[in-house]
Amino acid sequence: MDLTDQSRPQTASGDDPDGRVENAPSSSTTTASVGTNDRTETANPEEQPPPLPPRPNTLSLLDEGGASSRSLRQTGPVNLQSKATTAVTIPDIASNDAGKENYNLRGLAGALRAKASLSHLASSRASEAGDSASVRSSVPHTEAGEMENVFGDLLAAESGVVQQDGTGLLQFPEFQADDVEDDFACEFEPVGEVEEGEDNEEMVLEKWKSKRKHYLILSAAGKPIWTRHGDGALISTYVGIIQTIISFFQDSDDHLRSFTAGDTKFVVVTKGPLYFVAISRIHESETQLKLQLEALYMQILSTLTLPSLTHLFSVRPSTDLKRPLQGSETLLSTLADSFTRGSPSTLLSALECLKIRKAHRHIINNTLLKSRVNSLLYGLVVAGGRLVSVVRPKKHSLHPGDLQLLFSMIFEAEAVKTGGGESWIPVCLPGFNSSGYLYMYVSFLDLREDSSNVADDSTTKEESVAIVLISTDKESFFELQEMRNNLVEQLQKNYSLQVIKEAIDRGRPATTDIVPGTVLHHFLYKSRANVQFTMSSYDPEFSSISRRRRSVSLSS
């Protein structure tokens, strides 16, 4: 591998047995190679070649990382491995096809934690993969004008910006102490309203612009329906601009998916008569933002159902959807804030289960099965937003998106905990059936020792356990209430509630609890087959909101 030229992406070239240099066939990359032990014979036999310069070592290679390939040929040979390297051709280089999203590569360097040495690159064993690949080899190909931005973090690391801690690990800028932590909490504060007779419009508008992330929902007619920050009057001008841009592409039989302006990414998702727009400055990909907008769409369907939404706009295309959605704005805002904070379940589209022993979970499952009634469709035991147990019909599994909507509604909406911790809620689960309503009975349990079983307003999300029973019969409230009472009684008798409480108190395990003495700070594993994930504790490395969000964003 040619380590001395790191100023721009390169491919390695092969040395033939006669000492000739063959460049790899590439139209957009530069090839530099110096053959080993090459001696050029001159026409005059009396002329002696100049002495060879001293062989560079690893540290000198690091210092000379900015040299060009032309200067390499002039300074003399470099010690390469004896085996000829393999040229990298155009098919070996990842490319970003037109129409696909532009990869945000600023997180690449931040995600790396490598040892501060190149000794692992100077192995005595000849390796074709090692000689033909580098950190830059895995980066999607971009135009020459974007090269500086794409590799800015890597070049900064080579120039000494990256610091080394006491463990010998490189501390990349993305995971250093966040200077934005102090004002990240302001992201969720209201921007205020423009008051009549008061000259505060500019101040409110500046607060709105200072937000790092915005979500907008508007109709095809250009009417604002919902926005995470501000109100319709404040953003009406911007909504008109966005609607004009979307309509311009639609008139050309094209669909606008995303575009970037500076460090701000705009993503647009069209769902029938509705436009969903995400505006982000916190380094998220198009795919991540698209999934978030689709989750907001499912939240709207959980309130209106798809037939009702279609009927409203078929009768009157300029329908104002604010009135039908009145009361669900809090749920939309709560879901949007979970994306901004970096909620793993929402960003990964997966569920997290409470960590308990298999035997204990088996007891809870059997208790839930024995307590079920005829009107029950789904039954769940949820602790702190993590699934403990679920019963369902054999051929009807719960969609992860539906469960996320339920958990967001149950644990984030304060109104659900009113009424002594007991609620009866009609809800549409779009993944199950987007055309009709189901009826959900929710009861919260407080497992604190100095309280009764029923949760009160002081019970936090992590301290409470929710019994969720779902039925297709809107008259089954009392039947499900009786099932809940029997279930709680049995869970107390077999000490399952105590097992759940202890698991909640323990929290997520630290990496050192799993592998003592490990240098691993944090891990997250997602099982695609089971649509579940597990993760270690955030503390102490990822205690801040911004660092947590960044780590989950990289994982997703």
Curated annotation (Swiss-Prot):
Please provide an example of a Pfam family that matches this protein in its UniProt record: Fuz_longin_1
- Where composition is biased (Pro residues), the residues are 47-56
Name the predominant localization. membrane
Q: Name one GO cellular component term.
A: Mon1-Ccz1 complex
Would the keyword Cell membrane turn up in this protein's UniProt record?
no
The UniProt entry, under InterPro entries, shows: FUZ/MON1/HPS1_longin_1, FUZ/MON1/HPS1_longin_2, FUZ/MON1/HPS1_longin_3, Mon1
Q: How does it sit in the membrane?
A: Peripheral membrane protein
Q: Where is this region: Disordered?
A: 1-80
GO BP terms in the entry: autophagy; protein targeting to vacuole; vesicle-mediated transport
Q: Which UniProt keywords apply?
A: Autophagy, Endosome, Membrane, Protein transport, Transport, Vacuole
Composition bias (Polar residues) maps to: 1-13, 24-45, 68-80
Q: Which compartments does it reside in?
A: Endosome, Multivesicular body membrane; Prevacuolar compartment membrane; Vacuole membrane
Biological role stated in the UniProt entry: In complex with CCZ1, is required for multiple vacuole delivery pathways including the cytoplasm to vacuole transport (Cvt), autophagy, pexophagy and endocytosis. The MON1-CCZ1 complex acts at the fusion of vesicles with the vacuole, through its regulation of the SNARE complex during the coordinated priming and docking stages of fusion, and particularly at the stage of tethering/docking.
Which family is it part of? Belongs to the MON1/SAND family.
What is the protein name for this chain? Vacuolar fusion protein mon1
Q: What is the organism of origin for this protein?
A: Aspergillus terreus (strain NIH 2624 / FGSC A1156)
